[in-house]
């Protein structure tokens, strides 16, 4: 059995690994490199213990590249006391950098004989592939190709009218296993450990309250109770929205 996947993204890479382990051949087609989304090195992903077990079943050992989180502390604005906390000696979840997980899965796939990938040069190539009898099944996880425009008319779009700011801080080495979220007046600010000396920052705020990079850094310094910050990485920002077709 052969399956065709459209889109070079984390979803399709993990799906490819699962399918191949089940004895199914995969051919991944994606837009040319200059059309692929730029890699965001600040982006992180949270994985539950069940997620980790599932991935390990398909030879994807995320624990080697992720940070185990065993505590979660929640604070209200300037309060020094938590209003809610979770503690588990084993682990509550893992945090891993998105690009590290992407690279890890992709390197494994490149070694598999049942995995192939090709560039798509123009829109008409998508339609030609759909007519080919080589594949028993097609999966499309690209949101901006002709397949969505031609076949999916009931797209669900949701604009949350909010902006997220993300960055990573370098700090002193410590046992960094506690995720912290502070509900500031502007919006939630999260400290998400990604190693013993690096922590990811995520701040979400209504678009009407947008801030600049320096204001974001000052906000982090104001609410930081845990780290001796050495430096910030580039501060990225993006609009929060949801798209389903």
Spans of model-derived segments:
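Conserved Rossmann-like nucleotide-cofactor binding loop
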Residues: 11, 34, 145
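Glycine-rich FAD pyrophosphate-binding loop
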Residues: 6-8, 18-42
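FAD/FMN-dependent oxidoreductases across multiple families
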Residues: 209-245
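Hydrophobic anchor at the start of a short beta-strand
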Residues: 3, 20, 24-26, 62, ...
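Beta1/beta-strand and adjacent pyrophosphate-binding region of the FAD-binding site
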Residues: 1-11
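Conserved N-terminal helical subregion
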Residues: 53-57, 66-152, 156-165
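Central beta-strand plus flanking loop segment that forms part of the substrate or channel wall
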Residues: 49, 147-179, 184-187, 195-197, ...
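N-terminal glycine-rich dinucleotide-binding loop that anchors FAD/FMN and/or NAD(P) in oxidoreductases
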Residues: 41-64
């Amino acid at each position: 059995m052969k399956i065709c996947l459209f889109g070079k993204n984390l979803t399709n890479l993990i799906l490819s690994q699962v399918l191949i382990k089940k004895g199914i051949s995969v051919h991944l087609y994606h837009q040319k490199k200059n059309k692929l989304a730029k890699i965001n090195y600040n982006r992180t992903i949270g994985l539950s213990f069940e997620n980790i077990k599932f991935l390990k079943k398909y030879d994807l050992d995320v624990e080697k590249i992720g940070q185990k989180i065993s505590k979660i502390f929640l604070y209200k604005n300037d309060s020094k006391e938590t209003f809610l906390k979770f503690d588990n000696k084993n682990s509550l979840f893992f945090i891993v950098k998105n690009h590290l997980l992407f690279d890890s899965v992709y390197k494994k796939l490149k070694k598999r004989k049942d995995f192939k990938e090709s560039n798509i040069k123009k829109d008409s190539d998508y339609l030609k592939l759909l007519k080919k009898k080589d594949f028993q099944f097609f999966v499309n996880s690209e949101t901006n190709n002709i397949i969505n425009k031609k076949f999916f008319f009931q797209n669900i779009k949701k604009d949350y009218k909010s902006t997220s700011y993300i960055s990573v801080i370098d700090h002193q080495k410590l046992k960094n296993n506690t995720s912290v979220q502070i509900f500031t007046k502007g919006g939630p600010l999260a400290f998400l450990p990604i190693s013993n000396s690096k922590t990811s920052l995520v701040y979400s705020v209504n678009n009407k309250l947008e801030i600049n990079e320096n204001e974001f850094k000052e906000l982090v310094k104001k609410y930081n109770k845990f780290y001796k910050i050495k430096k910030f990485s580039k501060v990225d920002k993006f609009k929060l929205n949801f798209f389903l077709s």
